[in-house]
């Protein structure tokens, strides 16, 4: 085995950073999604920085302490005041064998019933209470998705179908999508996204990541920018505004449903071209150059083939959005083979109470 997992069975001497769990149901033997709920919020972020630093040092031979400004895992607005709770605008549940809504036990298929979900935003919690999600009896195995976006009314899907007022909503115009709004300075970007499609779950994440990406790309007025793994177009619209009338944005996404959302969200943006297909295949078919490349790959990272295709376009800089420190470090090492060095990095605590973090890295040559 490359690694071992262990569970604490007894605490002989508690760390000063150990606190009463903010979510006892996510403790030992409990549900997943809150594995750090017994750790003080500041200590969670310091530990995540240590993990990020260790992966970059081990896989990319980069010392995080050499970067300026100094890298810390940043909390998002409102999180400290809420104690790292009530941030999720999307919550997925499943009914257990007795018909109660709950979540899977950590690294298990067993469903444990819940009475509440403390990471859920206030709007999600209100929706759950209004629809009696945790007190209603469901058919065992029922999938329950609660979505309360920043920008429109909440939506409840039951086994993928709209649910309203205690029953399935069979109206032809029943809502299956939501509207998200991201405010950047004096400009507001509006996105229509499938209710069960991908969108950042933290209420402040879309704005925080987009600001970091725009800071990372710098002045791109008149430039050609590639937006790879572009999803529903979170970065595409702000990048289109940044390149201006003389620039272009090529957005590439492999997921068909995300591309449908992206086409709606990019409607009217004349300088945006959308391509549907695996990123490596689209890049192989399109040999045009790029001034700047933005990548936001899934957890597995971009990988060597995509990195080589990106480097072959000789952009002046690459802005890499990562949700896995090891994948980021590996791809930073691949980019280094083509002369790109890590010049700045920001890390965000988008998932308090869990081991996950998000990073935005800028590489230049």
Set out the residue ranges of the language-model regions.
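Short alpha-helix boundary/capping motifs
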Residues: 62, 338, 363-364
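A polyampholytic, Gly/Pro-enriched intrinsically disordered region
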Residues: 191, 342-343, 365
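Residue-level signal for inorganic ion chemistry
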Residues: 34, 324, 361
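Core SAM-dependent methyltransferase catalytic element
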Residues: 356-365
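S-adenosylmethionine
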Residues: 275-357
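Accessory RNA-recognition modules of RNA-modification enzymes
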Residues: 1-295, 300-308, 314
